[in-house]
Amino acid sequence: MGQKINPIGLRLGINRTWDSRWFAGKNEYGKLLHEDVKIREILHKELKQAAVARIVIERPHKKCRVTIHSARPGVVIGKKGADIDKLRKKVADITSSDVVINIVEIRKPELDATLVAESIAQQLERRVAFRRAMKRAVQSAMRLGAEGIRINCSGRLGGAEIARMEWYREGRVPLHTLRADIDYGVATAFTTFGTCGVKVWIFKGEILEHDPMAQDKRMAESDGGGSSRPRRDAA
């Protein structure tokens, strides 16, 4: 089953935690869940060029704290913070809570599975040879310290008449090992021949302690190998 299931969902509560971190009663839960979906849709639409990997939503008392993990924080903030103010207003229109937006910079986008998948998808849309795009992504990830990476591309690759799936793997990607820190990302390339799917698994080592927040702490604490700066409140 480890081969088929989403590796992030499999590890929730073990060494990964949820991207929506709040509790609500029966009457409020559905409403807040729909708000989360709308907030993510709007932010991904507005920040297409900002290389956004994750959006974490927390709801302390009468507040909505949105943390955007981006490889290009300058694009999110905009000139003198103008763009982030617009984003805050758009999010505030969806939710009745006070909105606070934080931005976390991803220092090594080559080690973030979502950003790697989106990068390959964009290259496929620009008609870059799919094998070259995949090999380049594999080499970059391994050079920057990944212990293993696997990339799947499927669809009418290179404009072929019959759709197929091709994959590359380097190093170890132990999908069955629950203590493995595996990042997973998907993206879709809309080419002139049809859609192509891209899936990326990146193995970053093992997390031995049983702590749902272990992966976030590891990202924040590791100096050279970490993928995030300390949080910066943009409110």
UniProtKB/Swiss-Prot annotation:
InterPro entries xref list: KH_dom, KH_dom-like_a/b, KH_dom_type_2, KH_sf_prok-type, Ribosomal_S3_C_sf, Ribosomal_uS3_bac-typ, Ribosomal_uS3_C, Ribosomal_uS3_CS
PROSITE patterns to which the protein is assigned, alphabetical: KH_TYPE_2, RIBOSOMAL_S3
A biological-process GO annotation: translation
Location of region: Disordered: 215-235
Keyword Metal-binding: no
Keywords from the UniProt entry: Ribonucleoprotein, Ribosomal protein, RNA-binding, rRNA-binding
SUPFAM superfamilies: Prokaryotic type KH domain (KH-domain type II), Ribosomal protein S3 C-terminal domain
Positions of the KH type-2 domain: 39-107
GO molecular function: mRNA binding; rRNA binding; structural constituent of ribosome
Keyword field contains Ribonucleoprotein: yes
Entries under Pfam families matching the protein: KH_2 (PF07650), Ribosomal_S3_C (PF00189)
GO cellular component, one term: cytosolic small ribosomal subunit
Its biological purpose: Binds the lower part of the 30S subunit head. Binds mRNA in the 70S ribosome, positioning it for translation.
Subunit structure comment from the entry: Part of the 30S ribosomal subunit. Forms a tight complex with proteins S10 and S14.
Protein family: Belongs to the universal ribosomal protein uS3 family.
Protein name: Small ribosomal subunit protein uS3
Organism field: Rhodopseudomonas palustris (strain TIE-1)
